[in-house]
């Protein structure tokens, strides 16, 4: 029965779920929801129900309801029916139709009373009222829904259409659901109206019943039509606001460009720009200059290009061909002409369609704004997205990276050839065919690969085994190839850069170098476009076939297994399509000087992007090349002139422009922003604000623009929310903390923000209304005059006259002096001070502020000038600093600290008077109470005497008590005697403990006794025996008493007596133990306190020692390092060993946690000594050391054998388990095994120790490094690579030679690859990983160093700078060249800096002519003075090396001191450096910058030099050396810049340094310190005032006192250097994180540079110089057998794994693949035995299921980047998978 019930219940649930998820129910639900999207159509529906009555009213109601339902039905049908959707879905269509109709209906209803509304006839067809109501409701229902804030409800039906299969049923059910909801809504409205009519309470209202209000109600009924017309008008206005009206939008004056794209993504990329279409007309690279293929600029929309099909073929030609008879004929060129017959109606058709019906609008701008890095409309780094259908995974899908050329071509074919159709195969056949094709491709690739490997086993030539790249060849005999630029088989690095012609560049005669010949016709153009009236078959006969041959030496499909027969039609189509270019020798036309470039293109509208803002226009009014009209709306700003130079110019004007501007006055202006929200937010002109993010205004004055999304998070108005919690907090705060001083917290910050917002609102109010600034300006000037000349003099007269009446001396002179001191300075609207008399320009319209300096406050009396004491002086200065002696005048005559701020509190005139009165009253009150105070003093003396008498009596009583106690002690029991002894012991123990000094491990504790009593052990034993005897005696006495009581009682024992006895016994034992506990508790408590005291006392003792030692060590080491920077490391270590250290560490844990001062040689500690120390300490006290030894297992493993560890473990001293029992060869999971073998990502413990800021012991690291010296200094392959650099430079391996000598090129390529393979895993010797030293990871560990206070001194003497600290990027390419004589003993190194302009290729001649040298790669750490400052041209891809990338990969090339030489200005040494005074530098002489290396012993100069930039040569300035004398500290390098100043051109030292700093060295982000921004603005405001004053001294001093003028920012010195700016903290040099676009070669170069770890290898043998003679490619890398393209294809096909997706485990299949390949390659079974002789097969060659293979697929399929740049990164990512 239960089963049956559950079965029924389950069926019911499933049935309910099916019903709920059915199409009908979902449609009903969504249709019902759309009812709530209320639109303007409800206005007409409600109007018909409310207003119309009678028979005509009922008809109108029916027609309104019918029209309403019909309109909604049309909307639902438009979801399913595409033409109706297109007609109703276009927003402009509805706009154009709706707005005129709405306006007409509004005016028609508004002027209704003009028509005759008498008795109507029954002929309603003539009246057409009912039809109008029907049309109103029908049309308004088609409008967009707008009343609800979200239109999501109306769109739910559209959204669900994508999920629904039975669409028609869904549309029908949704309409029924909407109809049900509409009926319910109308019923509810009717019920509400009926309830209002029938409700007695409303009808019986006194107001309504009164005659006065009856008239109003009747008027309301009569004016109902007017109310609805007003609502209709609001609807019209709302639609006008929302409507994107393209007719009235502003078109930008700039060119709206149309970019003609015909190629792949490379058109848009800067680094690898390619031709858009492979053309055969340009065989040489120089032909690129002839082609303007990239852009066609349409100026102001004048060039209209065949917009019918949006395709065209562009041609450039110079002359029209002539035939031999002299008759002009261009029959072959007809298809190149643009049809101009359509121009007469295009002016009407195209603009009308574009303006009205194109919602994207041709003049709609995009948000691509010009940037330093981005010049184009679309970012070059972005992927190319083009949607089209394609076959993927055997199914037809939408591809988002479909080639646009292919789709364009396909559309052209479909339009021009109507019979061209595609047959769609079934989905099953497509997927099966796709899988079969991919399987066949995979098998073919696999067979080819195995065949190549088997050929290698047969010892064939390796060069012939490699797969060759294929190239297009169009002349087999001469072997003339297609240019690399147009060769589709070549990709990546072989492609060059396309040089674009400038816009509007005309093809001149010099470009016409094409030979005369037959008429060249593109056959695809001939097919698609009508050339002439000849038939297609006739033109085919005239084709002179000239096919393109392809050179393929080793192709995967070069030898097909079966010959396939092809039909004649296939051959003919093949000839037509693949013989792209044909010649027609029968043509009788002779072409003279004609050049044609044909290209299939599709016009793509390109939006304007090089826009400037209004602010940039204001800033660059005086500059050239600034567009006249800005394209971006900035925040409203006005230039406020703050200074005008009225002096006449006496200079000589040589320029015409200067002569024209001679009469103009030089003005300095500041930009003033309006004090309201920026609703523009960089809005582009021509775009619509309605399409931006919603910026809703809900306040009259809104300080900040907000979106409605964040409406709940902002402070709302009072009627929106009532903050009870905030009110409660304020009440509690007022109750509890009235008298306490409040601290600055978040609430006060909020108050300040609220005040600032209030101030901005007031400013916005004055700035927004018309003539408000004029009114305010007049009021301010009036208030200023009244205050200065009327109110204040009147107050002075009243005050002094009252003083005279009160018989006091008047203060006329003091008051008048203060009155004259008050200044009313006119300021601009934002507070820039001008002067007392000068008004700002346009102050009536722009606004004005009046600032009062030294405001006059009326005082009752003036204090005497004689200062009474130092305290009064200090108080005066303090008050002066706190008081602000200025304020801004308000309209009401008040003062504020800030413009539009709250009124400032004035010092009260009567407050000092009241204070003085209070003082006088207090003095008067004190006189009657003098007698009482004297009496109080005498009473205290009497009390003291009484206390002394009392104390004397108490002492005597205590003495008598003591005597009595001594007498009673003689008869005391021995138990109390024992207590006395224990108390004595305690006191003695306390005295001993207080005098005991606690040291570290040097103090050896012989016993664990807690007392150090002077009693001997015998006495203690005797005492214990006595206690036992006493206890026994007492127990015997108690037993005897019990026996006596028992005998007196009955013989029969009772049950109650037993209970009583047991309770008595338990009570006695409890009492006894309680007494013992009470007796011993005091000593136990004292013992605990002593233990705590010991630990705390030890810590307190150690804290000052630790701090003092750290302080002394850090300061001493910093001083040592700063004085001896370039000293040898050995001397430094000797100095370290000589230091006097304070030994304060007590445990091994402290020794380990200490970072710098651990100089013990742990290896010298004998194990006997260690265990002797351990045996001396008791096990119970060993808990401190136990945790330390267990935590630091790796350290104890150095000096403790395993046997001794076991012994210690057995004794219970240490729970020790050997951590490193499982080595790498253990049988563990393969995945874990592989991860563990990846030592690149498994950081050593040294790195982790540095990360957690624990410095491990230096000696252990050195010992382990010494043990593994063979690993570092082996004659490995990487060491040999650098030795070959001389030979490499002599042979000049560059592009030209690489083409001539392919064998050397191949050899070089395999040396690179083999070097990377061997280097990464050349050191795989097994050693104890618990030591934490992994020699492969020196690079990682060196970069993971964190600087703290204790190691900060190491930064100064570091040999090289970590490039992660400062990121260098050169604006121009800098070529650093060495001039170093390695044989000479002079320690002179200078580096030459040259500036080149941006060029396409780095020239190779300068590189080749360099002096060949061997870069001392491994000797940089030994002696810094011998190091040359060179830019080592790395032998991997030397053409692509820049200085910045070189420094990033090899930061040790230039030390810090030489790199940042410009900031190391010292004035300690009196050694002066002077430069050569040369008159001029010739233009042929190359300027150089020399660095000075100062030797400490010699104090001599290393070199002298000068600098001159190419940019200065172009401007031809003749600089004069500034006679500066700079003192340079020892061991620092500094550059001197030689500048010669021209008489015509004056440059300060600051400008010269700024120019040098920004243009030559590196790009930094120079930002001001954040707190200086307001200071600088305040300084500028004060400067504007001081410039106008004749005697500015007093104002300057007062401004400095007030803090308005900060002296650190004043540029007092003329020669103000960057060093001083940086020292003051004004200028901060930060590294710039710029997005640098690197080409592929640079990425590969940097990837290889990661693996080249810098090691200390000072010497390299000369016998490796002839390393080039060795055939390194004999030890091949299997991945390079296949070409990169086939490699990727093979990997992707393997990843698909078409048939065996779930057949086996991935790891097993992976292992099998590896084993099969390794058995073919190497017949030896074990790969791990001899690692030096075998080249290991890397598992990354076959990444079946690795992460980066997915990235490769992404690049291969989705066209994110070009070329195979992931292979070099993969080298370092994965290691060989071990096979056991």
From Swiss-Prot:
Q: What is this protein called?
A: Protein TIC 214
Pfam families documented for this protein: Ycf1
Q: Which GO terms describe its cellular component?
A: chloroplast inner membrane
Membrane topology classification:
Multi-pass membrane protein
For bias type Basic and acidic residues, the affected ranges are 254-268
Keyword annotations for this protein, in alphabetical order, are: Chloroplast, Membrane, Plastid, Plastid inner membrane, Protein transport, Transmembrane, Transmembrane helix, Transport
Task: State the organism named in the record.
Answer: Draba nemorosa (Woodland whitlowgrass)
Q: Where is this region: Disordered?
A: 251-275
User: What is the superkingdom listed in this entry's lineage?
Assistant: Eukaryota
